[in-house]
């Protein structure tokens, strides 16, 4: 169960963060270092802001944070010293559209394509048989499997990965999402220009224009001359994807009784709800309240399933990657009910 982690927590001093800001080109980080430094920052911040110490603490995130949040949460639960246990009033964690383990998240895409009528039943059954339900680590010598996967790729190459119902828009995605999605190169093309007006990711371009504006930088108290052009994603960063799976962290945290809410947009192709269901099922938790709809303003907002030890999985109907971006009202209702310990 990831033994040894709690004995090797390096300290991240203020100089560490200064180096992060001043030397972006040379900064090297990764999954574990990211999680450890977030943990240490949180612990030290609460020590410096003692009025918040007694507040219930929930760690949250979405997308690739699915690889980071469980590590942070377990680090807090372990406690690197007596002081940490006294300071952090940990109650649980929340994750939306979370990347968790490539084997589950990646293999689920083929199933999702078929469920959403993006590929035919015949093609799905052929790939399922020839690839033996393994679509990530495929032997190049298995030519029939490779051929089916190529056909599937051609059928789905121009589907919007973030939300399959929206128009396909080539987007300037960060490197972390390239790793996360593990899908078509065309849809991951890094545009030299900016997204087409009307595409959802056009707001990323607007953010760049806004943050580069001198008056905005002045209002934010950014030191004059330090940022000539704001960059949303630093592609030069040396990032080490050193954690393959965090499934064991979820199991450990559930065993310790921490509350968990895992939710997915059911039209998200980046991290499909089916992939999330797969790793949750691998935990072998007992089902307390089986699959049922949850309602907002008299309408079905999604579906939920409650597992033992306060572990909840929910889908949000019509939402993409990430869920609150597409369904803010429903997402807030879900969060408000869960944080108040009410049924969804």
Model-predicted regions and their roles:
Residues 1-344:
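Terminal and linker regions of secretory-pathway proteins
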